[in-house]
Design a protein with these regions (language model features):
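Divalent cation-coordinating acidic motifs and surrounding scaffolds
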Residues: 1-183
Length: 183
């Protein structure tokens, strides 16, 4: 296999960036955009953090190539506490929603995957209420989102443990057009 990375340097003061690694046989990128995230906090502070990376391209399979959009994220941390840092992650979710809405304007049936370290669980405000990612497939509305990880957390499976309990911050969320597709 031959893999290639896609990376755009962002403004994160620590030099932390997000990237997308793909198999050159299975995926052909056509467009790459980095979206600046300015995390707003309750104290009035604004921090430029990691870009949200949107990679558009074609999945190559047995049939015709399938156009897909992948948004790679690493949302602001919980530094300072979950509640006091929540506005940063809510802002990140709003940016993802805005990116998706822009894609939908051009492609109403676009296929979108949202993935990365969201620093929130599927049931937290940013995922459940801002992005409106649903726990069950049947609850997903047109142009809505399904959180593929939520039910794993219900079974006690997480991606990190903190103070003796599991969290599932690393998530893959897909949109409604992908629910009926077999990729």
């Amino acid at each position: 296999r031959k893999y290639k990375p896609i990376l755009i340097e962002g403004p994160d003061r620590r030099g932390v960036d997000v990237g997308f690694l793909y198999d050159t046989v299975m995926f052909k990128p056509t467009k790459v955009n980095g979206f600046e995230l300015k995390a707003h906090y309750a104290d009035g502070g604004v921090i430029k953090t990691r870009l949200q990376l949107c990679v558009s391209g074609y999945l190559m399979g047995e049939g015709k190539p399938e156009k897909i959009h992948v948004i790679v994220n690493h949302w602001p941390s919980r530094y300072g506490g979950e509640l006091s840092s929540r506005p940063g992650r809510d802002t990140a979710a709003m940016l993802v929603k805005s990116i998706c809405d822009s894609i939908y304007l051009k492609e109403p049936k676009a296929k979108i995957i949202i993935m990365g370290d969201l620093n929130d669980d599927p049931f937290n405000h940013s995922c459940k209420d801002v992005l409106k990612a649903r726990k069950y497939r049947e609850d997903v509305e047109p142009q809505g989102y399904f959180n593929t990880m939520w039910q794993m957390l219900d079974r006690g499976i997480g991606s990190l443990a903190y103070n003796g309990s599991w969290n599932l911050f690393d998530q893959i969320i897909i949109n409604e057009p992908l629910l009926s597709e077999r990729l």
